[in-house]
Amino acid sequence: MIELKNVSKVFTTKKVNVEALKSTSLQVKKGEVFGIIGYSGAGKSTLIRCVNLLEKPTTGNIIVNNQDLTTLSAKELAKARQKIGMIFQGFNLLKTVTVYENIALPLRLAGIPKTEIEKRVEKYLRIVDLFNRKDAYPSELSGGQKQRVAIARALSHEPEVLLSDEATSALDPETTDSILDLLLKINEEIGITILLITHEMNVIQRICDRVAVMEHGAVIESGTVKEIFTNPQHVTTKKFVNSAFAAKIPAEVQKELQRTGEIVTLSFIGNSSGEPALAIATKRFQVYPNILSGNITQLKHEAYGKLVIHMQGEQNEINHALSFLQEQGIIVEGGRTDYGKQVLFG
C-alpha cells in the first residue's frame, strides 16, 4: 500500500545542508494503522510530507497504491493525490465559508458532479457526527469539531490512504480520545489505510497496529505495538514506552530498596493481565512483594499492564517466584538475575 525505499531529504541553505531524513525504508500494509513516533526534530513530519510529495525527496522512491510517485508527471501526481487524504494539526479550514462548503468546494474543483457532491458531503458529515452543524462556520466550532470537519473533507475524495500529521496535538485529552476513536472507526468500517505521526505514546497504543520510532532523521526501531511495548530495544523507545506509565521511582529510593530486596517490573499482556499470578506466587513461595507502582492500559485490541514491585525474601525463593511468573506469560524485567533487560524508571 505504502512503501518508502531508501528515501532521504536534504534541505539546502546558503550556509549548510541539513539532512532531515536519512536513507529510510518503510512499508505500510493495506488496511492497517501505522504510527510514526519521535521527538521534535526526529524527521517524522518530513517523512509524512514526502509520502504525498508535499516535500520532494532528495533520493529514493515513494510507492503508494502501486504507483511510484517520484516518477509521475505533475498531472499524474495531482490525480494520484486524490487517493491520498491528509489531516493536519491546524485543521486548515476556510474561515469564511460553512462546514458544508469546506467539504464541497474541493470536490467542485475536482470536477465531481453536483449530485455526487451532495451525497458525499452528507455521508461523511454523518460519519464524523457533524451533519447537524453543516451550516455553521469554523469560528462557531470547537477544536475537536474543526478536526472532524477536516477528516470529513479528507474522506470526501474517497482516498485509499489517510495521512495524519499530528492531528490531535492541539486538542485536550478528552477531545483527543474522541478523535482517535473516530479514526479507529473509519479504519475498521471503511478499511482505509492510516499513516500517522505523533510524539504522544497514547496515540500509538490506542489505535495503531504497528509503529516506527524515529530519531535524528532515521528509523531506529519498528514492530507491532505489542512488540514495542513488551520488548523495546532502543533507549529512546524505552523512554516512550515508560511515558505511558505515570509513576517514576527516584534513584535514591531505588538504591535504598535494593539493599533489602529486588526491584522488578512485571508486564502483563492480553489474558495474563487479569490472572492473579502474583498472589499465587506469594502463597507458593516465601516471597513478600510490595507494590511500588502499577498501571493498566488498553492497546488497540488487548490490555497491557505494568507493575513495579519490591520483592523481599531468600534469593532462591525470589528466583523460583520470578520463574513461575514467567511461566504464566508475564514479562519479568530487572532484579539481580537475568530475567530481562533493566527497565528505565526515570
UniProtKB/Swiss-Prot annotation:
One of its GO terms (cellular component) is plasma membrane. It catalyses: L-methionine(out) + ATP + H2O = L-methionine(in) + ADP + phosphate + H(+); D-methionine(out) + ATP + H2O = D-methionine(in) + ADP + phosphate + H(+). It is a peripheral membrane protein. InterPro entries: AAA+_ATPase, ABC_transporter-like_ATP-bd, ABC_transporter-like_CS, ACT-like_dom_sf, MetN_ABC, MetN_ABC_transporter-like, NIL_domain, P-loop_NTPase. ATP binds at residues 38-45. It comes from the Bacteria. It is found in: Cell membrane. Disulfide bonds: none annotated. It is an enzyme of class 7 (translocase). Gene3D superfamilies: 3.30.70.260, P-loop containing nucleotide triphosphate hydrolases. Keywords: Amino-acid transport, ATP-binding, Cell membrane, Membrane, Nucleotide-binding, Translocase, Transport. The keyword Ubl conjugation does not apply. Residues 2-241 form the ABC transporter domain. GO terms for molecular function: ABC-type D-methionine transporter activity; ATP binding; ATP hydrolysis activity. SUPFAM superfamilies: ACT-like, P-loop containing nucleoside triphosphate hydrolases. The keyword DNA repair does not apply. Its EC number is 7.4.2.11. Belongs to the ABC transporter superfamily. Methionine importer (TC 3.A.1.24) family. Part of the ABC transporter complex MetNIQ involved in methionine import. Responsible for energy coupling to the transport system. PANTHER family: AMINO ACID IMPORT ATP-BINDING PROTEIN, METHIONINE IMPORT ATP-BINDING PROTEIN METN. The complex is composed of two ATP-binding proteins (MetN), two transmembrane proteins (MetI) and a solute-binding protein (MetQ). This is Methionine import ATP-binding protein MetN 1. It comes from Bacillus cereus (strain ATCC 14579 / DSM 31 / CCUG 7414 / JCM 2152 / NBRC 15305 / NCIMB 9373 / NCTC 2599 / NRRL B-3711).
